Amino acid sequence: MAGYRKLGLPTDQRRAMLRNLVTSLLKHGKIETTVTRAKETRSIAEKMITLGKRGDLHARRQALAFIQEELVVKNLFDNVAPKYAERNGGYTRMYKKGPRRGDGAEVVILELV
């Protein structure tokens, strides 16, 4: 059994999509996506916030290797991570929004707490 969801995509496309979703979540504070994509995004975003809490140069470079925009990484380390200094995990929340009109896929809103 795999430790991650394949989401019906080849590895490079799946990785690119998750990088985009995590970058958008950290940039805007919330995103709207399907349940399975949100669960994968949540896992990675929480790891990025934990890197931000660590705050050293190596953690910043690890975050830069995944997050696509340098300004988002700067915001993560300067604003987002300090907000969660006292919290051990559970930085995100998911709300069910209902089925998507086009294909009936269950849509959720994933946001930072």
Swiss-Prot record:
PROSITE patterns per the UniProt record, alphabetical: RIBOSOMAL_L17 (PS01167)
Gene3D superfamilies: Ribosomal protein L17
Pfam families per UniProt: Ribosomal_L17
GO cellular component: cytosolic large ribosomal subunit
Gene Ontology molecular function: structural constituent of ribosome
Cysteine disulfide partners in this protein: none
GO terms, biological process: translation
NCBIfam families xref list: L17
UniProt protein name: Large ribosomal subunit protein bL17
Name of the encoding gene: rplQ
